[in-house]
Amino acid sequence: MIEQSLSKPSFSLSIPIPKAPKSKSSFFCSYSKIRCESVDYPSLTKIDAKHPQNSTTINNGSSSSASVDLKNNEKGPYPYPGGGKMGPYTGRDLNEKKPEWLRQRAPQGERFEEVKESISRLNLNTVCQEAQCPNIGECWNGGGDGIATATIMVLGDTCTRGCRFCAVKTSRTPPPPDPMEPLNTALAIASWGVDYIVITSVDRDDLSDGGSGHFAQTVRAMKELKPEIMVECLTSDFRGDLKAVDTLVHSGLDVFAHNVETVKRLQRIVRDPRAGYEQSLSVLKHAKVSKKGMITKTSIMLGLGETDDEVKEAMTDLRAIDVDILTFGQYLQPTPLHLTVKEYVSPEKFAYWKEYGESIGFRYVASGPLVRSSYRAGELFVKTMVKESAKEAAAIS
C-alpha cells in the first residue's frame, strides 16, 4: 500500500515516534506522516490523527474540515463500522450487540477434556483452538453423531499472512516445519479411531512450495496407516501455484477445501493482500480438473457488509467451476484489533442461503450462524458423497 501512495485519493496519519530526550526530566516525541491509499472510499482523502485516542481531523479536500471527538462519537464520520480508535474497519461497534443465538456455553465435559489432553500430550496444533472456533465444545464432545472430531493444523501454528478476520498468530519468519510432524500426526489420528479427519494449515509463504509437500506427506502417512480413513484438506492458496495444488490433490486426499472467505468486493478489506478472489477460484478450479472425482469445497463468512446480490454472484462463480460443497457462517470478531461485525445475520437468512445454494446445484450446503469450514465435515451425507465420487471416477478410468 505504501508503494501505491502516489495515486489519489489517499490519507496520511501523523504517528508519534519516540525521540531521544535531551534531559531526564522530560519526554519528547516527534511525528512522522505515513501516506496510505484510500481504495474503496475516494471521499476520504486525508486523516491527521495526532492523538488517536482522543480526536482526529478529517479534511475532505475543501477549505473546511471537521474535528471529531472519538471518545464521545464511537463511529465518527468514517465510512466503515467501528470508528477510528483502532484503525480502519476495527474497534468495537457498541451499536451491535451479540444476539442470543450466538451465545455459547463455555466448553466443558469429560470427553472435551479427554480430547484436549490428548492433543496437548501429542503436541498437535488444532485450528479449533488457534482460531477460537465457537463449536469447539460441540465437536470435541462428539456433537450429534457421538464422534469427537478436531481439525488438525500442520506446518506449525504461526501464519505468514495477516488476514483481518483471523485470530491465528502471524510472523514473516515462522519456525521451520517439524520433519516428524507428518508421521506423528498420522500416528495420533490413527489411534483416535475416527473415519473422517480434516487437516488444515497456516499459510507458509516463506516455503518455496507453500508447504504443499509437507501437507501431502501428512496425507500419505495417514492413508498408509489407515487406508479407509477419509481425509479432507483445507488449504491455503499456495500463492496461486497450481503445481503445489497438484502435489496435494494427488496425495490421496478425498476432499479439497479452500475458502474464498467473502464476496469479491470485500476481498482487499478482509483478506491479506497476497490473497485474492480470482486466485482462490483458480485454485479450486484446478483442484477439480486435476483429478477425476475430486470433491471441492469452500466457505463464506457473512456479516461483513456484503449484499444479497454479492453473495449470489459469489455462489454463481463457485458453481461455474463446479464446487460441490459450500458453507456459510457468521463472522465473529476475535479481538478489537480485528474487523468489526457489520451485521448479525439471522438463522432464517442462513436457512434461505442453504435452500438457495442447493437450488442452483451445490451438492451440499451447511449454513448457520455458528457453522465453520470444518463444522460436522464428516457427517453421513458427505461421507456417502465421497464414496460415490470415488466409484464414479474408478468406473470412468
Curated annotation (Swiss-Prot):
Taxonomic superkingdom:
Eukaryota
- Annotated Radical SAM core domain ranges read 142-363
Could you say which enzyme class this protein belongs to?
transferase
Q: Region entry Disordered: which residue ranges? A: 49-85
Q: Which residues bind [4Fe-4S] cluster 1?
A: C128, C133, C139, S374
Bound how, and how many: what does the cofactor note say? Binds 2 [4Fe-4S] clusters per subunit. One cluster is coordinated with 3 cysteines and an exchangeable S-adenosyl-L-methionine.
Can you tell me which residues the record assigns to a coiled coil?
A: none
A family per Pfam: LIAS_N
Q: Which GO terms describe its cellular component?
A: chloroplast; mitochondrion
Key words of the record: 4Fe-4S, Chloroplast, Iron, Iron-sulfur, Metal-binding, Plastid, S-adenosyl-L-methionine, Transferase, Transit peptide
What range is the organelle transit peptide?
A: 1-35
Q: In which pathway does it act?
A: Protein modification; protein lipoylation via endogenous pathway; protein N(6)-(lipoyl)lysine from octanoyl-[acyl-carrier-protein]: step 2/2
Q: Which Gene3D superfamilies match?
A: Aldolase class I
Q: Kindly list the biological process annotations in GO that this record carries.
A: lipoate biosynthetic process
What Gene Ontology molecular function terms does this protein carry? Answer: 4 iron, 4 sulfur cluster binding; lipoate synthase activity; metal ion binding
The compartments listed are:
Plastid, Chloroplast
- Positions contributing to [4Fe-4S] cluster 2 binding: C159, C163, C166
Q: Which cofactor does it need?
A: [4Fe-4S] cluster
Which positions carry the signal peptide feature in this UniProt record?
A: none
Q: Do you know which InterPro entries this protein is assigned to?
A: Aldolase_TIM, Elp3/MiaA/NifB-like_rSAM, LIAS_N, Lipoyl_synth, Lipoyl_synth_chlpt, rSAM
Bias (Low complexity) occurs at 54-67
Where does it primarily localize? plastid
- Write down the EC number: 2.8.1.8
- Reactions catalysed, as given in the entry: [[Fe-S] cluster scaffold protein carrying a second [4Fe-4S](2+) cluster] + N(6)-octanoyl-L-lysyl-[protein] + 2 oxidized [2Fe-2S]-[ferredoxin] + 2 S-adenosyl-L-methionine + 4 H(+) = [[Fe-S] cluster scaffold protein] + N(6)-[(R)-dihydrolipoyl]-L-lysyl-[protein] + 4 Fe(3+) + 2 hydrogen sulfide + 2 5'-deoxyadenosine + 2 L-methionine + 2 reduced [2Fe-2S]-[ferredoxin]
Return the similarity comment. Answer: Belongs to the radical SAM superfamily. Lipoyl synthase family.
Descriptive protein name: Lipoyl synthase 2, chloroplastic
Q: What is the lineage of its organism?
A: Eukaryota, Viridiplantae, Streptophyta, Embryophyta, Tracheophyta
Gene transcribed to yield this protein: LIP1P-2
